[in-house]
UniProtKB/Swiss-Prot annotation:
Predominant location: virion
Organism the protein comes from: Suid herpesvirus 1 (strain Kaplan)
Keywords tagged on the record: Disulfide bond, Fusion of virus membrane with host cell membrane, Fusion of virus membrane with host membrane, Glycoprotein, Host cell membrane, Host Golgi apparatus, Host membrane, Membrane, Signal, Viral envelope protein, Viral penetration into host cytoplasm, Virion, Virus entry into host cell
Subunit structure of this chain's protein: Interacts with glycoprotein H (gH); this interaction is necessary for the correct processing and cell surface expression of gH. The heterodimer gH/gL seems to interact with gB trimers during fusion.
Function (record text): The heterodimer glycoprotein H-glycoprotein L is required for the fusion of viral and plasma membranes leading to virus entry into the host cell. Acts as a functional inhibitor of gH and maintains gH in an inhibited form. Upon binding to host integrins, gL dissociates from gH leading to activation of the viral fusion glycoproteins gB and gH.
Subcellular compartments: Virion membrane; Host cell membrane; Host Golgi apparatus, Host trans-Golgi network
Membrane topology value: Peripheral membrane protein
Gene designation: gL
PROSITE patterns recorded: GL_AHV
Record's protein name: Envelope glycoprotein L
Family: Belongs to the herpesviridae glycoprotein L (gL) family. Alphaherpesvirinae gL subfamily.
């Protein structure tokens, strides 16, 4: 077989052109590459809201990150309308450990690193039983819209 014919046979097999194949690969490139992975279904992302810092009574204005933590500037979220019990949440995912601050109507803020992250990630309602066990927030259902702003110092 001439070198030119050998090169043509090699590339035709590699590109999937029917033929003898190359090195045990009768299907060309289709057999080399694995089939694409089916992407996970999209989740409902929380809405990001603009931060406002003209309210001197806002509970987070004096909140400092834990000593020694590497925190990204605070990220503010409003819960999707079908989530109940808590009206707003601030997630600081780059802290170690991550911090989540939840509000329920008429209560102070609550720091909890697990419940809200799971709810936001999978788009399911917050686990009210888990919040009740913490004893720091009045868990109830309401129809109030998310707060206009909800936490953290302004990004520089």
């Amino acid at each position: 077989m001439s070198p030119l014919v050998a090169v043509l046979v090699f590339f035709s097999a590699a590109l999937g052109v029917p033929g003898t194949g190359v090195a045990g690969n009768p299907h060309g490139l289709d057999a080399i590459f694995e089939p694409p992975v089916t992407p996970a279904p999209p989740t409902r992302a929380p809405r990001r809201e603009e931060l406002e810092w003209d309210d001197e009574d806002h509970p987070l204005l004096g909140l400092e990150p834990p000593v020694g933590s590497r925190c990204h500037p605070y990220i503010a979220y409003s819960l999707p309308p079908d989530m109940t019990a808590v009206t707003s949440v601030v997630v600081k995912p780059y802290c170690s450990p991550p911090e989540v601050i939840l509000w329920a109507s008429g209560t102070a803020y609550l720091v909890n690193p697990f419940v809200a992250i799971q709810a936001l990630a999978i788009g399911e309602p917050l686990n009210e039983a888990a919040l009740k066990e913490l004893g720091e927030v009045a868990v109830h259902k309401d129809s109030l819209p998310p707060l206009r702003y909800n936490g953290g110092p302004p990004a520089e």
